């Protein structure tokens, strides 16, 4: 219940070689499209390399900056989770935040989530926003 309104859909569109992560928040749809070209611009994470090319801390910073530009109160959101997701031979970070806590009148705290996608070159993916 604390993460209501978050819908994540990951779809691989093979004809276009594109992966899309979708978040719905506050009546809007945010589609994070990642093309094969986007992935190729950044470093791969070879199986023989212990750590990813981009640190989790740098991915979090990039995601925080992107969230602050996307949402009016984005700078106030709390970090919830950082996930590594493989896409073919490359990886991306999925950085999830929870909005600032708000009461529902009954003393219970409700919070929605929002996820930002970060490439291994440190670039946060800018979403397409639609109503």
Could you tell me what each predicted segment is?
Residues 1-9:
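Sec-dependent signal peptide recognition
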Residues 45-82:
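Short, non-transmembrane alpha-helical segments in secretory-pathway proteins
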Residues 8, 14-15:
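Boundary at the C-terminal end of the N-terminal hydrophobic targeting segment
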Residues 16-44:
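Compositionally biased P/S/T/G-rich terminal and signal peptide-adjacent segments
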Residues 18-21, 76-131:
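Exposed beta-strand-loop-beta-strand "reactive/processing" segments of non-cytosolic proteins
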């Amino acid at each position: 219940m604390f993460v209501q309104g978050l819908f994540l859909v990951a779809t691989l569109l093979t004809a276009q070689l594109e992966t899309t992560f979708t978040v719905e928040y506050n009546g809007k749809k945010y589609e994070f499209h990642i093309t094969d070209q986007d992935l190729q611009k950044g470093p791969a994470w070879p199986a023989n390399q212990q750590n990813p090319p981009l640190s989790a801390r740098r991915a979090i910073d990039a995601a925080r900056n992107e969230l602050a530009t996307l949402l009016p109160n984005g700078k106030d959101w709390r970090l919830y989770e950082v996930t590594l997701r493989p896409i073919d031979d490359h990886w991306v970070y999925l950085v999830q935040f929870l909005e600032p806590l708000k009461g529902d009148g009954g003393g219970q705290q409700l919070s929605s989530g929002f996820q930002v996608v970060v490439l291994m070159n440190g670039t946060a993916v800018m979403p397409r926003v639609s109503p």
